[in-house]
Amino acid sequence: MTTFHERRLTLNIEITLRLATQSDLPKLEWYGQYTHFRAVYRRTFQEMEHGNRLMILADCQDFPIGQVFVQLRSREKRVAQDQQRAYLYSLRVMEMFRGCGIGTQLVQEAEAMVSAMGYTWTTIAAAKTNPKARRLYERMGYVIFAEDAGEWSYTDHRGIVQFVHEPCWLLEKAIGVR
């Protein structure tokens, strides 16, 4: 019988932070895990083309392994407001890459981009059921300023409206020169 000895490999993988392109949209579904957000991704990309949002990706060998989206304008001024507040949302990193600092880098890149655009505050939401996200944001200097019912809806890939109820904390952070 052959004896197998466990071996470990250390990989150095290059990750590029960049804005999404049209060709990234199908890949954002992560092999079916997020297919239900297909229409959301398409609409968000169109909003980015019109200067209302940003879609920042962590790219590994031409595949998005992480993302954060930024809303630059909103009717709800406490979340996003022209040249004052930008709202970071949909922060996501593939499970096998979590704990490597990619989420932190995505948030920092979003902060740097909106600061360069003249924004002085960023806001982000942490689901009350996700204490790890809240701790991450607080470590990065975010402070809770409100609670939100977290009620929203989206149209899935089959054209069916899905309603979401995800109570959350709203956190904010001063960025750039004020």
Task: Describe every region a protein language model picked out.
Residues 1-11:
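Short acidic N-proximal helix/loop "leader" segments that mark the beginning
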Residues 120, 127-130, 138-178:
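C-terminal "cap" of GNAT-fold acetyltransferases
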Residues 50, 84-85, 118, 163-167:
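Residue-level preference for beta-strand/loop junctions
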Residues 54-56, 62-70, 133-149:
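Conserved long hydrophobic alpha-helices within structured protein cores
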Residues 10-13, 19-96, 107-108, 113, ...:
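Acetyl-CoA-dependent GNAT
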Residues 90, 94-108, 117, 128-135, ...:
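Conserved glycine-rich acetyl-CoA-binding loop
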Residues 43-58, 114, 118-138:
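Generic detector of contiguous secondary-structure segments
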